[in-house]
From Swiss-Prot:
NCBIfam families found in the cross-reference section: ispH_lytB (TIGR00216), PRK01045.1-2 (NF002188), PRK01045.1-4 (NF002190)
Residue numbers annotated as active site: E126 (proton donor)
Binding site for (2E)-4-hydroxy-3-methylbut-2-enyl diphosphate: H41, H74, H124, T167, S225, S226, N227, S269
Reactions catalysed according to its record: isopentenyl diphosphate + 2 oxidized [2Fe-2S]-[ferredoxin] + H2O = (2E)-4-hydroxy-3-methylbut-2-enyl diphosphate + 2 reduced [2Fe-2S]-[ferredoxin] + 2 H(+); dimethylallyl diphosphate + 2 oxidized [2Fe-2S]-[ferredoxin] + H2O = (2E)-4-hydroxy-3-methylbut-2-enyl diphosphate + 2 reduced [2Fe-2S]-[ferredoxin] + 2 H(+)
GO molecular function: 4 iron, 4 sulfur cluster binding; 4-hydroxy-3-methylbut-2-enyl diphosphate reductase activity; metal ion binding
UniProt name for this protein: 4-hydroxy-3-methylbut-2-enyl diphosphate reductase
Function in brief: Catalyzes the conversion of 1-hydroxy-2-methyl-2-(E)-butenyl 4-diphosphate (HMBPP) into a mixture of isopentenyl diphosphate (IPP) and dimethylallyl diphosphate (DMAPP). Acts in the terminal step of the DOXP/MEP pathway for isoprenoid precursor biosynthesis.
Keyword Iron-sulfur set for record: yes
The gene coding this protein: ispH
Positions annotated to bind [4Fe-4S] cluster: C12, C96, C197
EC nos: 1.17.7.4
Length: 315
């Protein structure tokens, strides 16, 4: 039995930063620490942080006044920030810096009162937070996730139009949508840099490499993780048996019948411990008759600093 491990896989710099912000805040201030939305979309991570004193909330009014509040890696709207400030909360922002970059861009479009097309999933926290950077977005900001939706757009001024994208989309699918948008709106203003993040792109490239080598692919990630779902879609479209799993406990023995080569990757919010647990499960299942191969991919050196307040407290 051969196991092929995709590289890079698992935590990206933004996820790593967000988790460290929560952990450091708990260490410095003591529990409880409140977190608005899941800090990252992974069950294992969220449950681990709950055990050490994190309380995850969906409403700012559920946070006691003057408590410590952390915004998730997906970012929040300006209205949420305003509400948190009204409650005199001590705020630490774990928004991924690459999401913050998109926020800055849409704020610029808002100042110009430009119309905006956002490519992304309407109900995803990142999109909700991004739309919330635009003042009075009604009839100004349009969210689409397919080429078919472009023809339904009612753009008033194609010469004063921007587009942005969610950071965790399929690179291939998004490029097709962008091509179609630019064909219909040739004067649309592009982001200064592409919005899909390096980690999303690298993990999609790495899964394409192992697809060619395996009979079955396990994508480790939670069902509400956008980037993990995109990895699953890529694998599934290839025709290979593909499974999105949170842990090794979800693996059914019947999936492994007649399988000689197994591929494993993990979404950007899934910790390496879950990968190793899957590998260990397979070792036991195949009675240690297993060869493990690391499939080379892009080397990631990006690191994001945690807020200065937390760094100063640690010192």
């Amino acid at each position: 039995m051969n196991i092929f491990l995709a590289n890079p896989r698992g935590f990206c710099a933004g996820v790593d930063r967000a988790i460290n912000i929560v952990k450091n805040a708990i260490e410095i201030y003591g529990p409880p620490i409140y977190v608005y939305n899941e800090v990252v979309h992974n069950k294992y991570v969220v449950n681990s942080l709950k055990k050490i004193g994190s309380i995850f909330v969906k409403k700012i009014c559920d946070v006691p006044e003057k408590s410590i509040l952390i915004f998730s890696a997906h970012g929040v709207s300006k209205s949420i920030l305003k509400e948190a400030n009204k409650r005199k909360l001590i705020i630490f922002d774990a928004t991924c810096p690459l999401v913050s970059k998109v926020h800055h861009e849409i704020k610029r479009a808002s100042k110009l009162r430009s119309e905006v097309i956002i490519i992304g999933h309407k109900n995803h926290p990142e999109i909700i937070g991004t739309i919330g950077q635009y003042n009075n977005p009604n009839k100004k900001v349009f969210v689409i996730q397919s080429i078919e939706e472009i023809c339904k757009l009612k753009i008033k001024d194609p010469n004063n139009l921007f587009y942005f994208t969610q950071t965790t989309l399929s690179v291939d699918d998004t490029n097709k949508i962008i091509f179609a948008i630019k064909k219909k709106y040739p004067y649309i203003i592009e982001p200064r840099k592409k919005d899909i993040c390096y980690a999303t792109e690298n993990r999609q490239k790495s899964i394409k490499k192992i697809i060619k080598l395996v009979d079955i692919i396990f994508i480790i990630g939670s069902k509400n993780s956008s980037n993990s779902n995109r990895l699953f879609e890529i694998a599934n479209k290839s025709g290979k048996k593909s499974y999105l799993i949170d842990t090794y406990k979800e693996i059914k023995k019947s999936w492994l019948n007649g399988v000689n080569n197994i591929g494993i990757t993990a979404g950007a919010s899934a910790p390496e411990i879950l990968v190793q647990q899957v590998v260990n499960y397979l070792k036991i299942f195949y009675k240690n008759s297993v060869n493990i191969y690391q499939v080379d991919g892009d080397i990631e050196k990006t690191k994001f600093m945690i807020p200065k307040k937390l760094i100063l407290k640690i010192k």
